[in-house]
Amino acid sequence: MAYVDGVFRHCNLTIEGGVIADIGFLPDSDNVNGDNGTIVFPGFTDVHVHLREPGFSYKETIRTGTRAAAHGGCTTVCAMPNLSPAPDCREHLERELDAIRRDACIRVIPYGTITMAQQGRTLSDMENMAADDAGFSDDGR
C-alpha cells in the first residue's frame, strides 16, 4: 500500500537506488518483493534534537547525531540551541552552520535562541538569523 493523493492505495512500487522511481501497476519482474510487511517512508523530520556542537561535543556531535537520526529514518532534523556559544547572533549561528556543512549526513536546520546566551533577559538578534533557522527557542538552558 502507498499513501498517494491523500488516500492509501494498493499498488506496486519500483525502487531504484533507494529512491521510489514509480508507483503503479507494473509488469512482472525478477526483482519483486511480495507483501512482506515492509513499510516504505520518504523520510522523517525530527523537530527537536540536541546535537550539542559546538561546545558540548563530549555529549553528542553533529556527525554522530545525524548518523543516528538517519539510521532511524530521519532525513531532516532541527537542532536545539543549547550550545556554547549559543546561536544568539549571526556570528555564533555561522559557527554552527559551518560544523553542520562539514559533518552532517542529513539536512540539519538549527534553532536560534530567543534571548542572548539563553539567559531570558535580552532578545537575541533574531532578525539576522531568521533566514537560516527553523525557529527560536531557549530550550535546554
Q: Each PLM stretch: what is its role?
A:
Residues 29, 40, 116-118:
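A short acidic, often aromatic-flanked loop/helix-cap motif at beta-alpha or helix-coil junctions
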Residues 13, 18, 37, 48, ...:
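Divalent metal-coordination and catalytic microenvironments
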Residues 5, 23, 35-36, 43-47, ...:
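Fold-independent oxyanion-binding glycine-rich loops
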Residues 1-29:
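N-terminal metal-binding scaffold of metallo-dependent hydrolase/deaminase domains
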Residues 27-29, 35-36, 72-75, 103-107, ...:
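Short coil/turn connectors at secondary-structure junctions
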